[in-house]
Amino acid sequence: MDEKQQLIGSLPTTNDSFEQRAHAKKSSRWGTVKLIAACAVLVALLHWTFVVPKLPMKHGKHGKHHHQKSQCPQVEPLVPSQQTDELVNMDAYLKSPAFQNSSIQRLSGAVQIDTQSFDDLGKVGDDKRWEVFYPFHEYLEKTFPLVYEHLKVEKVNTHGLVYTWQGSDAKLKPTLLMAHQDTVPVPDATLDAWTHPPWSGFFDGKEIWGRGSSDCKNQLIAILESVELLLDAGFVPTRTVLLSFGFDEEISGGQGAGTLAPFILERYGPDSLAVIVDEGAGISDEWGVTMATPGVAEKGYTDVVITIRMPGGHSSIPPDHTAIGVMSELITLIEADKYPLRLDGKNPYLGQLYCGAEHATEFPKKLGKLLDKAQGQCKAKPDSLAAEAAKAGPAIQYLMQTSIAVDVIGGGVKVNALPERVQAIVNHRINVGEHPADAHAKIAGLAKEVAKKYGLALHSFDNTTESPSSISLSAFEHVLEPAPVTPTSVDGETAYSVLSGSIRALYGSEVIVAPGIMTGNTDTKYYWDLSRNIFRFAPGYDGESSGLGNIHTVDERVSIKNHVNTVKWFSLFIRNMDEADFE
C-alpha cells in the first residue's frame, strides 16, 4: 500500500565485500561519501517535512487558516455553512438539561446490558456466550427508532452491525464512524471493589459508572445519538454515512471487525471511504496547553510462543535445570535485552513534539533544543531526543520503543514430577520503523544461545512440530506491521483539516490539534484497505475529569459532560464532512 511507504528512504549501505583488493580503499572512501550524502538528504527531508510550513488552506465556506510559518499549523474552527431552523434548534437542544438527562438514560441503559467478551470464546453460533448481544441489539433498536426507520441496518456474522445512511451524491466517498459493542470482562474477585456495581449504569450526578461506560459504549451510543438528532432535525446527507460496530474488539476483533471490514470492502472497493473515525486517543492537558491528539497510526503487533520440551522424571533426581528453569533463563535474557529507543522520522509523535515546542508554554527547553538538533541526526546514532522525551514516563517511552511483555506462562503438572513441557507467550508492540520479523529474529538469537548451552534442538519459526529436548518458536497467526500513517497535511481541504476544525469549533481555538500514535491496536487494523484517512479519536472532553476513565479496571466511568461533548462532536463532524469537497 502507498500509505506504508516511508517518508524517508533507507540509507544506502556500502558493500564491504570486494573481489579486488586494489579497489578496497577507494570503495571505502566512496561509501563514506555516500553515507554523508545520505545524512544530508535525511536532513533536507526532515526539514521539508516538519519545518517548511504547509500552505494555508483556502477554506472558503468552511473557515480560514493562520497565515504564518508554522511547524504545527492549526486550522480555524470549522462550522457548517448550511443551517436550518431545525439544525439551530438541535444545537440548542444539545446544550440543554433536557438532552443531558435523556442522554444519561441512554448510556446508562447500554451499560446495564452485559456484553463481555472472553479470550476463549468459540465461533459465533457455537458458543452461547455470544448471545448477550441479542438483547443489546434490541435495546439499540428501541432506543433509536429514527435510526432504525431511516438507515439500512445489516448484521454481519450475526452480531456485527453496519448502518448505511445513504447520501444523495453517490460519487462522494462515504464517512465511516466506528465503535465496538463488547467490553472486557469483570472478574468476580473484583466485584466487591467497585464503588457502584459494574452493570448498574449508576449516575452520581456527574459520572456514569460501569463496565463499558468509557470503553466504548459511550462512543457507540454517542454516534447513534448524533444520527438520531440529525434525522429528527430533518438533515439529509449529501455524503453517505456508514456506521460499523464490531463485537469482539477486546479479543482482537477477528469475528467482528474481521468480517465487517471485508463486507464493506466488497461493497465499496479499496480506498473507497473518505475518512474513518474509531475509538482512540483523546484530549488532555500537555505542557501547559490543551491538546487533542487523534491517533494517525498504530504500533505493530506480534505474539511469540516459546515451547521448551525436556525429559521428565521424578523430582527427587532432578537435573541442574528443569524445563521451567531453562524457560526462566530465556525469559530473563529476553526482558534484559530491551529494544532501543528510536523516534523514526514518520512516527507521529515527532509531529506532536513539534506542536508542543511551538504552542505549549511549558514545553521543556532541553527537549526543544534536542528537537532542533534531531533534524540532522542519522539513525545510526543514539536517539538522544527519544531518550529525553521518554523521561516523561512509560506511556510516552513506548510510543518510541518496541515493547516486550511476557504475559502468559505455564508448565508442570505435579510437584514431584519434572516438567516435560513448558510454554510462554511474549507480546510485542512494534515501533514505527521496525517490523515483527525483527522481534522474531531477536528472540531466535537469544533462544539459540540457550539451546546450545543446554544441548537442545532449536525450531525457529519453521513450522516444525515440537520434538523432545527442544526449544520451539512460533508466532500467532495475528502478526501486524505498524499501521500506515494517515496524512496530516492541511494544505487544502483534507480529512485531517476537517477533523481538526471540528475539534476547534467545539472546544475553542485554544485547543491545539497534533498527530498522535496508539501503542495498542483498534478494530481499524482490519480497515486499512478502505481509506488512507484513519483516525483513532475519542472526541469527548470534560476538562475536570482526567485520565482514561478507568478503562479495563475497577470503577470504570465517564462524566456526562464528556459524553454530551462526544455527541456534539459527532453531529458537527458529520455535517462538516458532508460539506467537504476533498473526496
Language-model features, listed with the residues they occupy:
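Short pre-catalytic strand/loop immediately N-terminal to key active-site residues, enriched for Gly-Thr
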Residues: 204-215, 514, 554-555
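Metal-dependent amide/peptide-bond hydrolase catalytic core
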Residues: 2-39, 43-89, 98, 282-290, ...
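Solvent-exposed loop/turn segments at secondary-structure junctions
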Residues: 117-118, 170, 181-184, 248-252, ...
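Sec-exported extracytoplasmic/periplasmic mature domains
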Residues: 108, 112-116, 141, 145, ...
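Acidic/His- and Gly-rich active-site-bordering loop/insert found
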Residues: 23-26, 30-31, 47-211, 230-239
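Short beta-strand segments
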Residues: 178-180, 277-279, 538
